Amino acid sequence: MKASQFFISTLKEAPADAEIVSHKLMMRAGMIKKLGAGIYNYMPIGLRVIRKVENIVREEMNRAGAVELSMPVIQPAELWQETGRWDKMGPELLRLKDRHERDFAVQPTSEEVVTDIARSEIRSYKQLPVNFYQIQTKFRDERRPRFGIMRGREFTMKDAYSFDRDTDGLRKSYENMYDAYVRIFRRFGLEFRAVAADNGAIGGSGSHEFHVIADTGEDAIVYCPTSDYAANMEAAEALPLLASRAAPAEDLVKTATPEKAKCEHVAEFLGIPLQRTVKSIVLAKDTEAGAEIWLLLIRGDHELNEVKASKVPGLADFRFATENEIVDAFGSPPGYLGPIGAKKPVKVVADRTVANMSDFVCGANYRDYHYTGVNWGRDLPEPVVADLRNVVAGDASPDGQGTLEICRGIEVGHVFMLGTRYSESMNATFLDENGKTQPMQMGCYGIGVTRILGAAIEQNFDERGIIWPAAIAPFAVVICPVGYDRSEAVKAEADRIHAELLAAGVDVILDDRGERPGVMFADWELIGVPHRVVVGDRGLKEGKVEYQGRRDAQATAVSVADVVGHVRSQLAN
């Protein structure tokens, strides 16, 4: 391809509303153009990268035995009402009515539609297992779309759905997709981690997220460098930091702590380590009889993990209590709360570490006062115990193989064991060998195709622009002839190299725009093409051209006769 036959539209400066690196560089490189909030046109450069991502995904899905289909973007509300997600999903599900006042949804995922296909088409165990996938447009009406395509409203996603006869089959399908995802991300050329995760709104019994590692990632990835343990922050298990509880050594004392409402300020005022304080977090669970009030206790230097809290029996769909509810239950404003002496019945749950603490400090349920020397069993009943906190770097790994470290990542893929979450609610069944009706066991597997672009850039860039991994670069090689429109020798040699690389199956573009060298180099470094060949009169007089990899600090002189072979060897590496 020649640049004069393509469309290149780069910018020297990023738009003012571009916040993160990938958004800025994609706009400057002319990959995307904003059409509306969270909605973008994918320009030719950007679309080439998307197609390369899609091709790798499609090849590996087919290799794994999945079957491609295409489901509608607009889906009837009745299917979503069957599973309850029509009401549960809230405003992020874009709803619309047709001219007959019938309700529809713009798909954010396709569990309902694919389950409808399965229940209509699959009758017998002989038709199982099967794995359907599509690469399709999705839409989520984000409250605050930002960060370019990283948190846009419209996006392209590969979603796959497996159907099996039993849990053993589901496990095999899940492992098959997990392995396919590992191959996909390796082929992308990205540093990534697969981590244990929470199932979230989709539901099910087990899941893993695939994260591209990047310092700018919005997700915390917890891992043990000396073992295979890895999880996202929501799912990472926090072991108790105290092996056992020490015997009480202090008396319970109600101590004045004037205007000290935060654990940090209380610890400083009392001259004790922050680790001896206990933080009180009040939650409410709405019931037909009214709001149940729960008090969760974590150590003063720790943070509540809301996903873990939601898994405490009886606390699903909790909310944070209002200040009025807090004062009504405890007789004290926030900042001075604790498990001793609440005005009304409160359910108390202690984090594992708090359950092993002795002589700790907590609120006294009285403004400007805290209790010191608090001990379980003596001063208050033994608590219900649960893992409630976020892990921190240096915690013991749950597998006993070392300590945990934390890095940042960008979620680009997710695999779920759904089980019968959708097949039972939608009556997707089959007949087994004995003629008995059984619900299908489902798995769900997603990859954010367009999100891959942003994540790859966040991991691979420098001050000059994008540095694409070779497998998903818009072009593998760019030829930059200096004086293409003025020198017959330069034109002839550039055309020859271009033709030979094309004949060898190399994805190459020849910049025949007649731009100055500085403009050409700046454009292609910004766009991020991995390999560059520069042809100029000065080098040709010595029988040389210049080769430079996008990550190389200096160009290398290569003989005209060897340049095609040299480029091909670099591509092979």
From Swiss-Prot:
<dbReference type="InterPro" id="IPR036621">
    <property type="entry name" value="Anticodon-bd_dom_sf"/>
</dbReference>
<dbReference type="Pfam" id="PF04073">
    <property type="entry name" value="tRNA_edit"/>
</dbReference>
<keyword id="KW-0067">ATP-binding</keyword>
<comment type="subunit">
    <text>Homodimer.</text>
</comment>
<dbReference type="InterPro" id="IPR045864">
    <property type="entry name" value="aa-tRNA-synth_II/BPL/LPL"/>
</dbReference>
<keyword id="KW-0648">Protein biosynthesis</keyword>
<dbReference type="InterPro" id="IPR002314">
    <property type="entry name" value="aa-tRNA-synt_IIb"/>
</dbReference>
<protein>
    <recommendedName>
        <fullName>Proline--tRNA ligase</fullName>
        <ecNumber>6.1.1.15</ecNumber>
    </recommendedName>
</protein>
<dbReference type="InterPro" id="IPR002316">
    <property type="entry name" value="Pro-tRNA-ligase_IIa"/>
</dbReference>
<dbReference type="InterPro" id="IPR007214">
    <property type="entry name" value="YbaK/aa-tRNA-synth-assoc-dom"/>
</dbReference>
<dbReference type="GO" id="GO:0005829">
    <property type="term" value="C:cytosol"/>
</dbReference>
<comment type="similarity">
    <text>Belongs to the class-II aminoacyl-tRNA synthetase family. ProS type 1 subfamily.</text>
</comment>
<dbReference type="GO" id="GO:0005524">
    <property type="term" value="F:ATP binding"/>
</dbReference>
<dbReference type="InterPro" id="IPR004154">
    <property type="entry name" value="Anticodon-bd"/>
</dbReference>
<dbReference type="InterPro" id="IPR050062">
    <property type="entry name" value="Pro-tRNA_synthetase"/>
</dbReference>
<dbReference type="InterPro" id="IPR023717">
    <property type="entry name" value="Pro-tRNA-Synthase_IIa_type1"/>
</dbReference>
<keyword id="KW-0030">Aminoacyl-tRNA synthetase</keyword>
<dbReference type="InterPro" id="IPR004500">
    <property type="entry name" value="Pro-tRNA-synth_IIa_bac-type"/>
</dbReference>
<dbReference type="GO" id="GO:0002161">
    <property type="term" value="F:aminoacyl-tRNA deacylase activity"/>
</dbReference>
<dbReference type="InterPro" id="IPR006195">
    <property type="entry name" value="aa-tRNA-synth_II"/>
</dbReference>
<dbReference type="GO" id="GO:0006433">
    <property type="term" value="P:prolyl-tRNA aminoacylation"/>
</dbReference>
<comment type="function">
    <text>Catalyzes the attachment of proline to tRNA(Pro) in a two-step reaction: proline is first activated by ATP to form Pro-AMP and then transferred to the acceptor end of tRNA(Pro). As ProRS can inadvertently accommodate and process non-cognate amino acids such as alanine and cysteine, to avoid such errors it has two additional distinct editing activities against alanine. One activity is designated as 'pretransfer' editing and involves the tRNA(Pro)-independent hydrolysis of activated Ala-AMP.</text>
</comment>
<dbReference type="Pfam" id="PF00587">
    <property type="entry name" value="tRNA-synt_2b"/>
</dbReference>
<dbReference type="Pfam" id="PF03129">
    <property type="entry name" value="HGTP_anticodon"/>
</dbReference>
<keyword id="KW-0436">Ligase</keyword>
<dbReference type="GO" id="GO:0004827">
    <property type="term" value="F:proline-tRNA ligase activity"/>
</dbReference>
<keyword id="KW-0547">Nucleotide-binding</keyword>
<dbReference type="InterPro" id="IPR044140">
    <property type="entry name" value="ProRS_anticodon_short"/>
</dbReference>
<dbReference type="InterPro" id="IPR033730">
    <property type="entry name" value="ProRS_core_prok"/>
</dbReference>
<dbReference type="InterPro" id="IPR036754">
    <property type="entry name" value="YbaK/aa-tRNA-synt-asso_dom_sf"/>
</dbReference>
<keyword id="KW-0963">Cytoplasm</keyword>
